[in-house]
């Protein structure tokens, strides 16, 4: 899967009004089984999720994503999350995790609503940072 820096930066600007990813980080993502999903409405991007497989594990890190403010609360984030989980399962992965901060309460609520469990919390630059994880092999002994 191709993860083009210009495309990711365009999506970031649309959602966050600024660019957070670096060329170095995107190169890392590109080299670790990236999963990039983009949601469109009327042929225009309105949301995205970008993740990658953590080397040496069967875990997908859902690293970056969001939905444009004009399109929130319409099910787009839920659809992206479900599709990312399905792709991770298809890839044979057994876990998916994400991090979030207090300022992204909707992301935290979406994760909790979908069975993600809080596995760690600590202060990062004066703000609480949370790690959430979901076992994709529910009901399977492993």
List where the protein language model places each region.
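Conserved GNAT acetyl-CoA-binding A-motif
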Residues: 88-100
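C-terminal "cap" of GNAT-fold acetyltransferases
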Residues: 114, 121-142
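A conserved beta-turn-beta hairpin within the catalytic core of GNAT-like acetyltransferases
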Residues: 53-63, 72, 124-128
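Conserved acetyl-CoA-binding loop-helix of GNAT-fold acetyltransferases
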Residues: 67, 73-86, 113
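Conserved beta-strand in the GNAT
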Residues: 38, 44-53, 59-66
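Conserved active-site alpha-helix within GNAT-family acetyltransferase domains
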Residues: 78, 90, 102-120, 128
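Short amphipathic alpha-helix that is part of the acyltransferase structural core
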Residues: 1-22, 142
């Amino acid at each position: 899967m191709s993860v083009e820096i210009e495309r990711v930066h365009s999506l970031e600007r649309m959602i966050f009004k600024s660019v957070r990813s670096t060329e170095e980080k995107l190169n890392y993502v590109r080299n670790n089984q990236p999963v990039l999903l983009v949601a469109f409405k009327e042929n225009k991007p309105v949301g995205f999720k970008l993740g990658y497989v953590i080397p040496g594990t069967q875990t997908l890190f859902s690293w970056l994503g969001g939905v444009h403010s004009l399109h929130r609360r319409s099910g787009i984030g839920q659809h992206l999350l479900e599709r990312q989980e399905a792709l991770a399962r298809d890839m044979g992965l057994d876990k998916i995790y994400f991090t979030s901060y207090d300022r992204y309460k909707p992301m935290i609520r979406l994760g909790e609503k979908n069975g993600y469990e809080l596995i760690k919390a600590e202060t990062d630059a004066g703000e609480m940072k949370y790690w959430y994880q979901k076992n994709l092999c529910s009901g399977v002994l492993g």
